Amino acid sequence: MKKAVCIMSGGMDSTLCAVMAKREGYEIIALHFDYEQRTMRREKMAFEQICDYLGIKKRLNLDVSFIADIGGNALTDKNLAVSKSGLGDEIPNTYVPFRNGIFISIAAALAEKEGAQAIYIGVVEEDSSGYPDCKGEFIERMNAAINVGTAPETKIKIVTPLVNLSKADIVAKSLEFGSPLELTWSCYEREDEACGLCDSCRLRLRGFERAGVKDKIKYANLS
């Protein structure tokens, strides 16, 4: 059976990617990262619940806390306030330097070891105005580097099925494919209830609103 490493944060995008990979007939190897982010425990809980829901047996939760040691972002540095400035073109302080590059590199090592043919990652161009490691060009070049830097018989494709979708499209497709949106977690700041104010919450809420669907998770603030 063909295999895919799915990088899964516990959020709605990566969850839909895993659902889509499963529909494509892949055996899923779920990969989650703990990097001392503010909502690390809540994201890990979402990851485990989603894997249970999807019947994913092979799952790996890796400690990459060196990312917090590098610092420079509000997700790991509690001295920085999480950006609530809006969804503009500037790189926000929630950008974790080269995070997707680090994650993809580790996923490539796992894929090579497991003999997997694909890496699924839920990057979305709509998010990429401020996140350079979400852009299609970045993914293409990472894919080329992986296939140069692995054994000759290793052929891995990075699959980004959501890259050209809007958040509303992602909500609609999640409902169409039976992705468990109610188990996913997007908030950057809180673990009890989603804050409703951070940029990630606002992107999520805007997606549900434009899709004409109510989000079932609880929010502390709804404007």
Swiss-Prot record:
Query: What is the superkingdom listed in this entry's lineage?
Result: Bacteria
Q: Any idea which positions bind Zn(2+)? A: 187, 195, 198, 201
Instruction: Note the InterPro entries from the entry.
Output: QueC, Rossmann-like_a/b/a_fold
**What SUPFAM superfamilies does the record point to?**
Adenine nucleotide alpha hydrolases-like (SSF52402)
Q: In which pathway does it act?
A: Purine metabolism; 7-cyano-7-deazaguanine biosynthesis
Q: How is the cofactor bound?
A: Binds 1 zinc ion per subunit.
Where does the chain bind ATP?
A: 8-18
Catalyzed reaction equations: 7-carboxy-7-deazaguanine + NH4(+) + ATP = 7-cyano-7-deazaguanine + ADP + phosphate + H2O + H(+)
Keywords attached to this Swiss-Prot or TrEMBL record, sorted alphabetically, are: ATP-binding, Ligase, Metal-binding, Nucleotide-binding, Queuosine biosynthesis, Zinc
Query: What is the protein's known function?
Result: Catalyzes the ATP-dependent conversion of 7-carboxy-7-deazaguanine (CDG) to 7-cyano-7-deazaguanine (preQ(0)).
Please report the name of this protein according to its UniProt entry: 7-cyano-7-deazaguanine synthase
Q: Which gene encodes it?
A: queC
